[in-house]
Amino acid sequence: MSEVSSVVNRIRRATIERVTGETNITLTLTIDGSGQADVQTGIGFLDHMLTLWARHGLFDLQVRAQGDLHIDEHHTAEDVCICLGRAIDQALGERAGIVRTAHSFVPMDEALALVAVDLGGRPYCVVQADFVTMRVGQLGTDLVAHLFESVAFNGRFNLHAQVMYGRNDHHKIEALFKAFGRALDAATRIDARLGGTIPSTKGVL
């Protein structure tokens, strides 16, 4: 069996459990999925966004989260995204044979978003998005950038996300999550030309 076949045949899946004084979360991610999502965080809009992310990235995602929502949504939303980042990192393993970098433009009605990712192991995150409302559903719009940061830093990858224009905050955030799913899908694909090697001149990610 060739090296690249080994990479393709390995199930790229991870389950993360996080229990703190604020949250209790179990998250399972399959990179090479079919877009199936079963997300229950107690935050309806976050459930919607993660379901769209999985669908557009063709990831399989299951999330069960209980948190101190009687205070606010911050701890639960943040910890879910911490778990998602860690699951991405663990599921990718050594990241051998992956495309590594990719980007995606996604429109949602009047809004347009761009997300670019580099799975090179160097965590960084830049989010440029202006929102006109304080909340969309149960999620504060001031949390959106922090959620992407939580995924990127715990996933050990570089993420740049920009809402290029738009009026409706729901549409802007939805375009961001869809673009993130599609960019990550493209970056995690196996490139047979790499022959199962690490996509870096350093030889390690």
Curated annotation (Swiss-Prot):
This is Imidazoleglycerol-phosphate dehydratase. SUPFAM superfamilies: Ribosomal protein S5 domain 2-like (SSF54211). Belongs to the imidazoleglycerol-phosphate dehydratase family. It is found in: Cytoplasm. Keywords: Amino-acid biosynthesis, Cytoplasm, Histidine biosynthesis, Lyase. It is an enzyme of class 4 (lyase). Its EC number is 4.2.1.19. Its main location: cytoplasm. NCBIfam families: PRK00951.2-1, PRK00951.2-4, PRK00951.2-6. Pathway: Amino-acid biosynthesis; L-histidine biosynthesis; L-histidine from 5-phospho-alpha-D-ribose 1-diphosphate: step 6/9. GO terms for biological process: L-histidine biosynthetic process. One of its GO terms (molecular function) is imidazoleglycerol-phosphate dehydratase activity. InterPro entries: IGPD_sf, ImidazoleglycerolP_deHydtase, ImidazoleglycerP_deHydtase_CS, Ribosomal_Su5_D2-typ_SF.
